[in-house]
């Protein structure tokens, strides 16, 4: 594994890289559709998450058998329901005295499925929101309410961003401020809020926005991203700049770069039915997902810690992993020392208030070499559940024109791999 964010050539997707992106997208999409079919009333989120990871392991082992590069899960399967935003992936720890204490899906649950796969560091991530419904019955209506507003907003926002990326050309460059504005406008029209953690960012080999290595790009000034932190974090950044107009500072920062042909981009938009001051760590659920911070080193005291770190370096790379996927229970004894020394960073289960509903859409795309109104979507776009919002895109607005008025051919990969 080599991380070199300063290498500008690594940003242009060549034929070899394209094949790895394509295969990662095809296989993670195939796994996703099988996982989604299991999201039915009464289903165990632990069993669904485990099933998704098993599929990813099976699929990644089915190709590139003679190649000696890294391949594996880039994001463990998580099943986040209603007000849960990120990182709920219950494992063996949720089984107590033979009872599965993980959350079991119920009718009406707004359920976000997230997973990812990589080959040689070329990554495809996907998230999609579905509504858990009972078996179809005559006269069954759509899902309605604030959750439906959030689902519609996330759907149209991800579509609008994809359309903008597809129409990029040198005469009308797509900048970060344009991408941010269209997402914020759609949230406003559906009377919802963009959830902290949402992002639109350029990705490259091994670099998909992991917090532990994100600063490598920041240090090299090669990070091209639109991010939605919590409101208080945006205020803090504005205070640091001592600006009288924080919006102008943000706009200036986002206009220093623009989208280029043959780049890989991650679109990850979450919408909240209510404004969120911040996401909070779940008070009772311990993290099951961890990520190795390659920037931190320490002379470990415990043999179990050294053994565990060796396994992680060999098998997990720089991507998040589920602690249940570690091979040896003995090695798990070293988990505490690795986290205490910040070599492993836990990814807590993040939630908002119980009355809130969050919807998420995430897809990975590659811009085409010419401004041909084509975009290659590595993860197969999935239509939203049967929902109905009281709101819609307002006629004549940029959001409506971009979503519905631009003739964009979003090409999908073939998932029959």
From Swiss-Prot:
Class of this enzyme: hydrolase
Its primary localisation, in coarse terms, equals cytoplasm
Q: Where in the cell is it found?
A: Cytoplasm; Nucleus
Q: Which GO terms describe its biological process?
A: proteolysis; ribosomal large subunit biogenesis
The source's superkingdom equals Eukaryota
Q: Name one GO cellular component term.
A: nucleus
Subunit info here reads: Component of the nucleoplasmic and cytoplasmic pre-60S ribosomal particles.
Q: What does this protein do?
A: Probable metalloprotease involved in proper assembly of pre-ribosomal particles during the biogenesis of the 60S ribosomal subunit. Accompanies the pre-60S particles to the cytoplasm.
Name of the featured protein: Probable metalloprotease arx1
């Amino acid at each position: 594994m080599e991380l070199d964010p300063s290498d500008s050539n690594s940003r242009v997707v060549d034929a070899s890289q394209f094949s790895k992106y394509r295969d990662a997208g095809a296989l993670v999409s195939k796994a996703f559709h099988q996982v989604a079919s299991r999201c039915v009333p009464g289903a165990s989120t632990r069993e669904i998450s485990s099933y998704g990871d098993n599929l990813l392991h099976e699929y990644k082992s089915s190709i590139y058998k003679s190649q000696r590069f890294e391949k594996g899960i880039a994001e463990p399967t998580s099943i986040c329901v209603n007000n849960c935003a990120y990182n709920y992936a219950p494992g063996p720890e949720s089984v107590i005295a033979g009872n599965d204490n993980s959350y079991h899906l119920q009718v009406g649950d707004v359920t976000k499925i997230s997973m990812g796969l990589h080959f040689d560091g070329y990554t495809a991530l996907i998230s999609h929101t579905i509504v858990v419904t009972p078996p179809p019955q005559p006269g069954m209506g759509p899902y309605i309410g604030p959750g439906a507003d959030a689902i519609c907003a996330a759907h149209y926002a991800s579509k609008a961003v994809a359309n903008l990326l597809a129409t990029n050309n040198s005469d009308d460059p797509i900048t970060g401020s344009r991408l941010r504005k269209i997402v914020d406008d759609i949230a406003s029209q559906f009377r919802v809020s963009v959830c902290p953690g949402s992002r639109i960012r350029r990705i490259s080999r091994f670099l998909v926005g992991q917090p532990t290595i994100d600063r490598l790009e920041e240090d090299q000034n090669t990070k091209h991203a639109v991010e939605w932190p919590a409101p208080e974090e945006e205020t803090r950044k504005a205070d640091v700049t001592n600006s009288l107009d924080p919006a102008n500072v943000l706009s200036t920062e986002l206009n220093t770069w623009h989208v280029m042909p043959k780049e890989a981009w991650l679109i990850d938009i979450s919408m909240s039915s209510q404004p969120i001051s911040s996401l909070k760590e779940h008070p009772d659920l311990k993290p099951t997902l961890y990520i190795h911070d390659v920037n931190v080193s320490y002379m470990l005291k415990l043999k179990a810690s050294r053994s565990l770190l060796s396994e992680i370096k060999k098998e997990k790379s720089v991507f998040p992993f589920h602690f249940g996927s570690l091979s040896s229970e003995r090695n798990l004894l070293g988990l505490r020392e690795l986290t205490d020394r910040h070599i492993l960073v836990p990814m807590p289960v993040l939630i908002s208030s119980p009355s809130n509903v969050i919807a998420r859409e995430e897809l990975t795309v590659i811009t085409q070499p010419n401004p041909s109104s084509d975009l290659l979507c590595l993860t197969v776009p999935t239509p939203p559940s049967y929902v109905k919002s009281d709101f819609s895109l307002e006629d004549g607005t940029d959001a409506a024109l971009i979503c519905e008025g631009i003739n964009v051919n979003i090409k999908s990969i073939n998932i029959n791999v």
